[in-house]
Amino acid sequence: MGASVLAMAARGGHTHTVKLLLENGAFVDDCEHACVSEGNTNTHCSAGSVQEARALLEVRALLAAAQHGQGAAVALLLDWGSDARVCHTGTGWSALMLAAAGGSLSVCQQLVERGADPDHTNVLGNTALEVALQLRRRDVQKYLDNITSVRPRPDDEKKRPDVFHALKLGNAQLVKEIVEQDAAQVDVCNADGASPLMMAAVSGQLEVVQLLVEKRADVDRQDSVHGWTALMQATYHGNKEVVKFLLSQGADVQLRAKNGYTAFDLVMLLNDPDTELVRLLASVCMLVDKDKSKQRGKSALRRRASAGTPSPPEDKTGLKSWWNRMSNRFRRLKLTHTLRHGLSTNRLAPFPDAADVPLDATMRAEEGGAEVASPTAPPAGAQSTACSRTEDCGLNGTGSGKEDFLITTMLRNGAPLARLPSEQLKAVIPPFLPPSCFEPWSSERCGSLRDARSTHTHSQRPGRSSAGSDTASISRVVNRSIKFPSITKGPSPSNSGSYNSAHSSGGSNGVGGVNRHSDTHNRSGGSAADSVLSQIAAQRKRAAGLMDSRSPAVETPSPAHTPLPDSRPKLELQKRPQSGNSSRSKSTSPTLTPSPSPTPAHTPAPAHTPAHRPTGASADSQGSASTQQRSRSSGGSSSGTITDEDELSGILRKLSLEKYQPIFEEQEVDMEAFLTLTDGDLQELGIRTDGPRQQILAAISELNAGKGRERQILQETIINFQSSFGSSASTPRAATHTH
């Protein structure tokens, strides 16, 4: 039957044999190892016999000795290390139960002293005490009764299921019978601390929930594991009718689980919450908040009336209460002006002589419909004093001067500007748009046009350096698709000092550089077209009021033409020296390093071209013939800044990297492909040095970033131009002069 020799010897009480077997290597609690150790041929242990032995009763030596009351054998086995808590795998019977069934008190005492558990139950739910009761072992019963905590149940109680079993069955009638017979079953808890009401709320049994509530079950009871209530369980499982009933019975919606969630929070965690359920819980939460606020207000009034002292401020914590206070304060404010200037895209400055209206004077709190407005604001000290003395200045109507000062400071700091703009704006000169075709301008006509237009200009306060940038974007876009590499090298009467640095914010962007308008050199002659653009840019600067506060203009000597201004005042944003002529100009652009070396003051002109260029076709031919000398000359507006209109060879010369030009020519890298090169591409081309690669990558990044800025500025400029074109001052052109 699977019993080992050791088990049989212990069953018969043969202690000498048991000791002999143990001394020769028999295992105390393992019948399978006992078979192997004994070498019994009848019960030879192989892989199959081991599995069969596990399926049998697994008769162990201690269990056999305890069942037959062999106290000496039990003591010997325990001394050799047998576990007193060992039990049969199939039935759950322990050695203590077998000893109690046999009625051996001494064996029971030995087992308990060695660690046997008197509360252990078998598969039938019986303890050793119940086994002794059933078999009427009086001595063992008396001994185990004092040490057993699991008390035996009567037979009728065993036959009747508990309330949780009835809830699992969904039998409302059985639940009713149980709670009527024993009222304590209403609030009984299971192992997780859950009550029958919670279980009914989970399953959605509305009838059982109503029955338990009628039997005075605790509606707000929380389980011991998660701290959930019956309302939370019903909400999370979507039992809407149960939620309505529990709310009607006064369930607390403010109770929080151990993770801090309320019933409303749990319903919001659902993927598809019921809209009606959400509204129901939200309305109840709002009513509870209102009731609590009313109770706090009544208690505060009672304390104020009894003590005669001002009540302490109420609890102002939480986002909801803060938002309520702020909304009440802003409801009493009256804004006499709106903050249009901070939200408008119009960059024009206000009228110069308009009175400054501080923001503090635009806000006045009103009490009972009375409006208080003042064109000017008192000093800071006087204003704070007035706020502390009058009720009209208080946002709450209670004279809380400190809070009024804080809210005023918040609005002042959050406003776009410190003062509000005026409604009056001067007419704006529209940005220069090149016509579809140029006429052969002459120097005399340019001078007369300049004199005629200068009489119609008006002084205007400069804005935030945006007037020049508006025209820059249009002129860039007009000349963006055509690239003319020809730039005149020698100084001329028209362009030697008429262009500003590319980083100047006043009017230099209006005529963005010689290379920005190189198409005008080819259409109408470089000298004449440059002079026209210079005059228009100078006219815009005089209209902006910049010519009044700068140094007087120095005219370039020209024996055959009308003198033009050599240098114009400009706003230096990045502390750069103006590039008036080639003798003083050095590349100080912060965008690229190293900068090109300074060029000589005067470069000898070609043999077929005079030193001082006239106008017309001669200037045009000279401008187109000077392609190779463009980047080395710093005259005009060239200041070392890389632009997207520069050719690849010019960019390399500006970077002093002419030695790499054959590499790009050999690989047939054009300007479009150049703008897409990466560090790996440059290494593949053969540029192994880190310094030149970083300079080339910086130039590519600057050109790509400039294209994005031009598109953004173009959109803003077109909008401003369309809005201001109707009100711009129209100046008639002077009569056309022929050669």
Curated annotation (Swiss-Prot):
SUPFAM superfamilies annotated for this entry?
Answer: Ankyrin repeat, SAM/Pointed domain
* GO BP terms, alphabetized: pronephros development
Positions of the region Disordered? Answer: 295-320, 449-645
Which residues lie in Pro residues bias regions?
593-603
Which keywords appear in this protein's UniProt record, sorted alphabetically? ANK repeat, Cell projection, Cilium, Developmental protein, Repeat
Following inactivation of the gene, the phenotype reported is:
Morpholino knockdown of the protein in the embryo causes pronephric cyst formation and laterality defects, including reversed heart looping.
Question: Bias category Polar residues: which stretches?
Answer: 462-478
**Where is there biased composition of kind Low complexity?**
490-506, 582-592, 604-641
Q: Where in the cell is it found?
A: Cell projection, Cilium
Taking every annotated instance into account, which residue ranges of this chain make up the domain SAM?
Answer: 643-706
Q: Where are the ANK repeats?
A: 1-30, 57-86, 91-120, 124-156, 158-188, 192-221, 226-255, 259-290
Query: Sorted alphabetically, which Pfam families does this protein's record hold?
Result: Ank (PF00023), Ank_2 (PF12796), SAM_1 (PF00536)
Q: Where is the composition biased (Basic residues)?
A: 295-305
Output the Gene Ontology cellular-component terms: cilium; cytoplasm
Q: Which SMART domains match?
A: ANK (SM00248), SAM (SM00454)
User: Function of this protein?
Assistant: Required for renal function.
Q: What is this protein called?
A: Ankyrin repeat and SAM domain-containing protein 6
State the species of origin. Danio rerio
**In the record, what lineage is assigned to the organism producing the protein?**
Eukaryota, Metazoa, Chordata, Craniata, Vertebrata
Q: Which gene encodes it?
A: anks6
